[in-house]
Design a protein with these regions (language model features):
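Conserved Helicase C-terminal RecA-like lobe
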Residues: 1-15, 27-146
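Short alpha-helical scaffold segments that flank and stabilize functional sites
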Residues: 21, 81, 172-176
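Cytochrome P450 catalytic domain signature, combining two hallmark sequence patches
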Residues: 17-24
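SF2 helicase/translocase ATPase core recognition
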Residues: 1-16, 114, 122-123, 127, ...
């Protein structure tokens, strides 16, 4: 996915500010532990910017999120083909944005994150009701142990450092009882830290 110009600018600003902060921290003689924590925090901000800049800047225009635009296109292509989707993100804020997107489009969906109390009810609904085309799932909350064979498309909205966690999430659709071919999509923002995450996998 190619970032929009506004998104590239936002990403470059955050990257520049991260480099400046880390340089200041190093010059101040900070411990290795402090440097590591600061680096992880800055990487997190860059990864969030790749997903949707509104995660770091709530005033950022929604239509300038390249990944959301790409997801929208993929979603409608899949729906037109009669497919049902599992959409994973490690960021609950991303899932909330996708939830708002689906609500605005009038699409029914199931939703599961770490705070969901009705976990099995959501799973049963998706499995049994074929009028529900999308299941939004937090990677940590629903990446293991669920049987979601009603889906034949898996979308990873953002890459995870641990490829095993992604593979386990994709396996939710590959369970016994799956009689369709399952297609897995990974949305990766080109020229960013997401490509580095992919290489580390």
């Amino acid at each position: 996915v190619e970032m929009t110009e506004d998104q590239q600018e936002c990403y470059a600003d955050i990257r520049q500010s991260a480099e400046t902060e880390l340089s200041k921290l190093a010059d101040s003689g900070a411990s290795e532990g402090a440097m590591r924590m600061k680096t992880l925090t800055q990487l997190l901000r860059l990864r969030q910017t790749c997903c949707d800049p509104r995660l770091v800047d709530p005033d950022f225009p929604a239509d300038q999120s390249a990944k959301l635009n790409a997801f929208r296109e993929l979603l409608y292509t899949c729906l037109e083909g009669g497919h049902r989707l599992l959409v994973f993100s490690q960021f609950v804020k991303v899932l909330q944005l996708l939830k708002a997107e689906l609500e605005a489009a009038g699409l029914t969906f199931c939703y599961l994150d770490g705070s969901s109390k009705d976990r099995m009810a959501q799973v049963d609904r998706f499995q049994e009701d074929d009028t529900v085309p999308v299941f939004l799932i937090s990677l940590k909350a629903g990446g293991t142990g669920l049987n979601l064979t009603a889906a034949d498309v898996v979308v990873h909205f953002d890459p995870w450092w641990n490829p095993a966690a992604e593979a386990q999430a994709s396996d939710r659709a590959h369970r016994i009882g799956q009689d369709k071919q399952v297609t897995v999509y990974k949305l990766i923002t080109s020229g960013t830290v997401e490509e580095n995450v992919l290489q580390l996998q």
